[in-house]
Amino acid sequence: MFQDKGWILVTLITLVTPSWAAYKLQERYSWSQLDFAFPNTRLKDQALASGDYIPQNALPVGVEHFGNRLFVTVPRWRDGIPATLTYINMDRSLTGSPELIPYPDWRSNTAGDCANSITTAYRIKVDECGRLWVLDTGTVGIGNTTTNPCPYAVNVFDLTTDTRIRRYELPGVDTNPNTFIANIAVDIGKNCDDAYAYFADELGYGLIAYSWELNKSWRFSAHSYFFPDPLRGDFNVAGINFQWGEEGIFGMSLSPIRSDGYRTLYFSPLASHRQFAVSTRILRDETRTEDSYHDFVALDERGPNSHTTSRVMSDDGIELFNLIDQNAVGCWHSSMPYSPQFHGIVDRDDVGLVFPADVKIDENKNVWVLSDRMPVFLLSDLDYSDTNFRIYTAPLATLIENTVCDLRNNAYGPPNTVSIPKQAVLPMGPPLYTKQYRPVLPQKPQTSWASSPPPPSRTYLPANSGNVVSSISVSTNSVGPAGVEVPKAYIFNQHNGINYETSGPHLFPTHQPAQPGGQDGGLKTYVNARQSGWWHHQHQG
């Protein structure tokens, strides 16, 4: 009888567990410290003995997915980083702590070999034409230890042949003595030659545009929106208080192509809680670098504790962004006003998501998040007996489900209030991508994690699959009689265990207290719900 009551009690507890306890992001890879795929043990031992490889000095900061490869960047902030641009062969390493393979090879990761190699890479981007865009900062060190053996250079690789097809050095007029560029956004227009890249100069306070077709770049400088907010320079991450008050424009995302044939670039300074926007019609026009001040638009603030370094937008207008103060990933549907009540939290974790450094959406609408505990690495000491670096993944549809970003749960919703100055609508050409830059994108298997045979030499892409990529159906927006109505998803969250802060006008989900019984507490607490992985649950037996 008592056993029956206990079973009933457990059942009731399970039923009333709030939705925030069910992690959506699932851990795919994790490391205590990074390891690299040296050609053999002898060379690895030599690198360790010489100081060319110091495992404790390596920190991953960027991630990108294409086919069966997951790219990871490791900047040369300290000595002993053997490669800065690397990847994981996902066919050979389904999960665990795989060695990082230099891309495209070891020779191309030689520090200081400016014309032939990449010295330091941060954020990278794969475009829909099968090209990998990498900005080499040419730097070694960080802060006061920084040296510049090489100039800033854009490197573009063809992922079907694993060869570099373009290297472009930024001219001196596009940089200044304070320049530090870590972020990149890539804008593909009518075809693969109609491509532009945008670079955020975080400490030089500028935005640089590069045209693939013209092989030329130009700089937008001194706009006040590129500068840090003097009231937002205080940070608290993992129990560490620090000040990054000089950090300007950093995170960027691009909207889908609008009716006028252009996208909207959204951006935020790191020391800021506010988002800004500008049409790529302005950025693509070199003649507008000096007279475009009023073409930039200021949006609302996200709310307290909402610094962000990484953002990405899906092709149906869903923006994801990291919230480094909250150990969380947030969302916003760009058809809604940029107001805090329309911002959601898709996942949060005070252990696994300490500093979610990079967020990406791949060609199959799967989300990838890299967390690296960066402030602990820079300002304190990492515990190398603990897991420090993690890569998570989940379908975009799963992440936004039952949040304000899922318009399937919204009865009302006004159109987007981001007002870009109107221009005459230009006719759009068909999206005809040239064959040499648009390979067929393979679809990841959804029913089995069985290893595929080793790929042939120099070809790491899996065989083409006929799987159909599922899309997120989005209902059309309607405006309620009173104007802005509260979405159903917002009410759903309130009635399913997600509490909201009410300090001021900002409404963000608040983190629930940790349940008793955790192991050691703090960063040493293990996140068993994540480490199990949805692929293990779905494919046992």
Curated annotation (Swiss-Prot):
Give the observed phenotype of the deletion mutant: Flies fail to pigment the adult cuticle and larval mouth parts and show reduced level of locomotor activity and male competitive mating ability.
Q: Which organism is it from?
A: Drosophila melanogaster
Coarsely, its chief localization is secreted
- Which terms does the UniProt entry file under GO BP? cuticle pigmentation; developmental pigmentation; male courtship behavior, veined wing extension; male mating behavior; melanin biosynthetic process; melanin biosynthetic process from tyrosine; regulation of adult chitin-containing cuticle pigmentation
Q: Name one GO cellular component term.
A: cytoplasm
Assigned keywords, A-Z: Developmental protein, Glycoprotein, Secreted, Signal
Recorded name of the encoding gene: y
**What is its subcellular localisation?**
Secreted
Name the UniProt record assigns to this protein: Protein yellow
The family line of this record is: Belongs to the major royal jelly protein family.
Q: Which domain of life is it from?
A: Eukaryota
Q: By its UniProt entry, which Pfam families does this protein fall under?
A: MRJP
Q: Where is this region: Disordered?
A: 443-463
